[in-house]
């Protein structure tokens, strides 16, 4: 990703907003169970969206006893994939870890 786009992305705090909004998207996904789930990020960033793929598969973390789930998807800017994200959650809904990669 070029420096200007990367700076724009970070200057709006989008990584933190992704983290904050994911539980809401999780609830919507649980109710709809689509193959893919799109979410436009917000009125101030209409060209940024999330595309969720293959949600809720087990994450093999041998040192944790609870069921684990991994959310994975693409970060899209002007209809172009600019990166990906993954978040790990325990079966009871407790946040575990995340990865955000801007390419």
Where on the chain are the PLM-derived regions?
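A broad structural signal for short, well-ordered beta-strand segments within beta-sheet-rich domains
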Residues: 32, 50-52, 95
